[in-house]
UniProtKB/Swiss-Prot annotation:
Matches recorded under PANTHER family: PHOTOSYSTEM II CP43 REACTION CENTER PROTEIN
Quaternary structure, from the entry: PSII is composed of 1 copy each of membrane proteins PsbA, PsbB, PsbC, PsbD, PsbE, PsbF, PsbH, PsbI, PsbJ, PsbK, PsbL, PsbM, PsbT, PsbX, PsbY, PsbZ, Psb30/Ycf12, at least 3 peripheral proteins of the oxygen-evolving complex and a large number of cofactors. It forms dimeric complexes.
Cofactor: how and how many bound: Binds multiple chlorophylls. PSII binds additional chlorophylls, carotenoids and specific lipids.
Spans through the membrane: 21-36, 101-115, 140-156, 203-218, 237-252, 457-472
Organism per entry: Cuscuta exaltata
This protein's name: Photosystem II CP47 reaction center protein
Length: 508
């Protein structure tokens, strides 16, 4: 046929059997990729430290999505929360991966069957004897079935009526686990961070889909609407399908990047805005202040801060710190976190507590500034010693650690103080193992960043695809040159104003 590569899909334009075949093959490829990727990730995933080396630090992409839907155990005998599991059951990580691969194989065989047996009676219009599809009816069927699936997920899986529930956690990502949810039917259900909204919205959207599907199955579109929207053209289906996909891709890119109940930080890592707003730092200080108010010592209060919470408050876990084209997991960047050294508190020789100004997200280097409680700069690490007024040596800065591995250890040596001041720019200080993975020390993004970038990019691409195919189907007759009014519109002298049919010249 000699088609260029970008026009090869024309071969299924008027061939419903093979159109179905290529879609089944596409499903086979998607399911096969998902299952294979899951097995690869399970082969390289280390579940030994869910606090300091969670799945998102290791660059896992499909494991978080399985976990979000209620899969937490492996046939390897481990669970996502740590410890050993004796009876993981059929629906383990490996079980889900295997089911996807088996489904992929069945779809592969079905695609071959439909490619070979393309000339089925069901695809022919009995009145004309030509191949045709009742597209409005097919739309109704798909809408009804997707509504049933949507309703079933919300009413059974998420609520635990028949299923495990989904991953639910507290606002600081500390106590997450899979649990059933009650639907949130009030205004709170519209809060993107309220998990109950997932159940209620799926139930509501599923109900709407079922009703809309039944409507489209029982009511035929008016003739003018059918012709106006080109409902008989398969490219109309392509255009509107692309619209649905790009809209969904934009939505999930937003919920992933900005955070929501559907993208828990325990599974996908923190968002960049939690670093920008000092979200975890504020919670840590709130807990410390509460402990000090109960007459606990600094050492006692900081020792009670969960290592998991401290780890979130580290810039290396900010998905916006890794460049989009730096391949590899976060562990391949700054290394595998081994332990929290503790919280450093800096003081000058007058006993004032000093706070290190934290590095903003989009800086690679940042001056080391130590400010007091009023925000006044009291010390720094100068670029030029000759002009320094606030150097660590001149101000007499010391550092003491509370909590973590260096609990109650203090340093007054200027070189050591400056080392920890530089590291405090990056949030809480952790010991990082760079040797095991030969980590290069350059920050990487988390799966949250990769997912967002991929979906936003493809959404933009698909947006243009929607415009392209929508224009092709709406103006098909014009592009093909078969519009009955086309000749008259461009004929010189036919209209007083070129192309305006209201100004047609009258024959004398």
């Amino acid at each position: 046929m000699g088609l260029p590569w970008y026009r090869v899909h024309t071969v299924v334009l008027n061939d419903p059997g093979r159109l179905l075949s290529v879609h089944i093959m596409h499903t086979a490829l998607v399911a096969g990729w998902a299952g294979s990727m899951a097995l690869y990730e399970l082969a390289v995933f280390d579940p030994s430290d869910p606090v300091l080396d969670p799945m998102w630090r290791q660059g896992m992409f499909v494991i978080p999505f399985m976990t979000r839907l209620g899969i937490t155990n492996s046939w390897g005998g481990w669970g996502i929360a740590g410890g050993t599991v004796t009876n993981p059951g059929l629906w383990s990580y490996e079980g889900v991966a295997g089911a996807h691969i088996a489904f992929s194989g069945l779809c592969f065989l079905a695609a071959i069957w439909h490619w070979v047996y393309w000339d089925l009676e069901v695809f022919y219009d009995e009145r004309t004897g030509k191949p045709s599809l009742d597209l409005p009816k097919i739309f109704g069927i798909h809408l009804f079935l997707s509504g049933v699936a949507c309703f079933g997920f919300g009413a059974f899986h998420v609520t635990g009526l028949y299923g495990p529930g989904i991953w639910v956690s507290d606002p600081y990502g500390l106590t997450g686990k899979v649990q059933p949810l009650k639907p949130a039917w009030g205004a709170e259900g519209f809060d993107p961070f309220v998990p109950g909204g997932i159940a209620s919205h799926h139930i509501a959207a599923g109900t709407l889909g079922i009703l809309a599907g039944l409507f489209h199955l029982s009511v035929r579109p008016p003739q003018r609407l059918y012709k106006g929207l080109r409902m008989g053209n398969i490219e109309t289906v392509l255009s509107s399908s692309i619209a649905a996909v790009f809209f969904a891709a934009f939505v999930v890119a937003g919920t992933m990047w900005y955070g929501s109940a559907t993208t828990p930080i325990e599974l996908f890592g923190p968002t960049r805005y939690q670093w920008d707003q000092g979200y975890f730092q504020q919670e840590i200080y709130r807990r410390v202040s509460a402990g000090l108010a109960e007459n606990q010592s600094l050492s006692e209060t900081w020792s009670k801060i969960p290592e998991k919470l401290a780890f979130y408050d580290y810039i290396g876990n900010n998905p916006a710190k890794g460049g989009l084209f730096r391949a590899g997991s976060m562990d391949n960047g700054d290394g595998i976190a081994v332990g929290w050294l503790g919280h450093p508190i800096f003081r000058d020789k007058e006993g004032r507590e000093l706070f290190v100004r934290r590095m903003p997200t989009f800086f690679e280097t940042f001056p080391v500034l130590l400010v007091d409680g009023d925000g006044i700069v009291r010390a720094d690490v100068p670029f030029r010693r000759a002009e320094s007024k606030y150097s660590v040596e001149q101000v007499g800065v010391t550092v003491a650690f509370y909590g973590g591995e260096l609990n109650d250890v203090s340093y007054s040596d200027p070189a050591t103080v400056k080392k920890y001041a530089r590291r405090a720019q990056l949030g809480e200080i952790f010991e990082l193992d760079r040797a095991t993975l030969k980590s290069d020390g350059v920050f990487r993004s988390s799966p949250r960043g990769w997912f967002t970038f991929g979906h936003a990019s493809f959404a933009l691409l698909f947006f243009f695809g929607h415009i392209w195919h929508g224009a092709r189907t709406l103006f098909r007759d014009v592009f093909a040159g078969i519009d009955p009014d086309l000749d008259a519109q461009v004929e010189f002298g036919a209209f007083q104003k070129l192309g305006d049919p209201t100004t047609r010249r009258q024959a004398v």
